[in-house]
């Protein structure tokens, strides 16, 4: 593993998953891997789980970690190549990332889409510049299109709780008060459509189809109730339209996940990446039910990051 930005970087996912489960069973047993190593973490947008779990993961491996909030804690960064920097920006991303690479052994970066320019967002312009200028391995802490550490944590959660060899996993769209990016659902599809013991179904209103390159191999069902029938795991998440980029085409509250929806499943466990708008995306009754795995899932964010750091630092 040279960098970690998508499912493709996981390589043999079964081996990586087994490593994660071993690390979870003995989280402090690999501190020789991180001894005298430093993990750099750069955030271009707010974070709770990613920030804290990444720091914890580094410490668990015996490494140190530093955190930088781009812009707030640093000079304002210029992204454009060949820019004449006579305006508000004070340091070029080319110089900043090269310098940060001097201060760490692996660099975690969190960027975010504008939801205004599909070509720019899906071209991963900012993240690719960081990959270009970094001289150490780079981990995606979320990018404009993907959130691989979250999806890896989801996979760990399903793997450690499943009660049968094959499971049906459903990703359902949910309403929200604002337009959200497609990073989490894209990544969930990127991972779960490739898992050979998962029957993967995506359900959403028409017009909310995700980028087909991430949904290949999945069954798409526009009838939410039909999709939920017999499910073993349900992941709820809002996203804005990919086709009509960044737009909220409709926000039907009937898509909010309730106990009535969950009753259609095979006593399914519930997943959500958090943060969640309670009683907008998902009802309290689902979030607080015994079958809700949201806290265990969040805890596994440490394990997913720790496993990736283990691979990159060993």
Where are these regions (language model features)?
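Positively charged, low-complexity intrinsically disordered leader regions
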Residues: 1-52, 56
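Phosphate/diphosphate ligand-binding glycine-rich loop within oxidoreductases
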Residues: 32-40, 47-159, 277
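Phosphate-coordination loops involved in phosphoryl transfer and adenosine-cofactor binding
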Residues: 33-39, 166-168, 267
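Glycine-rich phosphate/diphosphate-binding loop of Rossmann-like nucleotide-binding domains
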Residues: 44-66, 159-237
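A short helix->loop->beta-strand "cap" motif at the edges of active sites that frequently abuts
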Residues: 134-136, 197-198, 263-269
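Rossmann-like adenosine-cofactor binding region
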Residues: 213-292
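C-terminal helix-to-coil terminal segments
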Residues: 288-314
């Amino acid at each position: 593993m040279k960098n970690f930005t998508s499912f493709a970087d996981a390589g043999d996912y079964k081996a990586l998953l087994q490593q994660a489960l071993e690390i979870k069973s003995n989280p402090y047993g690999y501190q020789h891997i991180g001894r005298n190593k430093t993990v750099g973490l750069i955030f271009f947008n707010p974070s709770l789980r990613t920030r804290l779990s990444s720091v914890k993961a580094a410490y668990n491996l015996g490494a140190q970690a530093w955190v930088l909030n781009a812009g707030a804690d640093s000079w304002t960064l210029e992204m454009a190549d060949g820019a004449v920097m006579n305006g508000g920006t004070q340091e070029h991303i080319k110089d900043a990332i090269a310098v940060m690479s001097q201060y760490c052994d692996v660099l975690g970066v969190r960027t975010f889409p504008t939801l205004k320019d599909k070509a720019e967002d899906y071209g991963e312009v900012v993240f690719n510049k960081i990959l270009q200028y970094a001289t150490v391995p780079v981990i995606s802490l979320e990018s404009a299109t993907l959130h691989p550490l979250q999806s890896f944590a989801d996979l760990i959660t399903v793997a450690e709780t499943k009660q049968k060899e094959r499971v049906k996993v459903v990703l359902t769209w949910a309403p929200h008060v604002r337009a959200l990016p497609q990073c989490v659902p894209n990544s969930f599809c990127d991972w779960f459509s490739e898992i050979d013991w998962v029957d993967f179904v995506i359900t959403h209103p028409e017009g909310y189809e995700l980028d087909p390159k991430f949904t290949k191999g999945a069954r798409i069902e526009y009838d939410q109730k039909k999709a939920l029938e017999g499910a073993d795991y349900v992941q709820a998440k809002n996203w804005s339209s990919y086709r009509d980029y960044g737009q909220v085409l409709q926000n039907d509250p009937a898509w909010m996940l309730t106990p009535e929806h969950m009753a259609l499943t095979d006593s399914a466990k519930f997943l959500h990446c958090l943060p969640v708008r309670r009683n907008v995306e998902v009802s309290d009754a689902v979030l607080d039910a015994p079958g809700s795995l949201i806290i265990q899932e969040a805890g596994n964010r440490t394990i997913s990051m720790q496993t990736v750091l283990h691979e990159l630092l060993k």
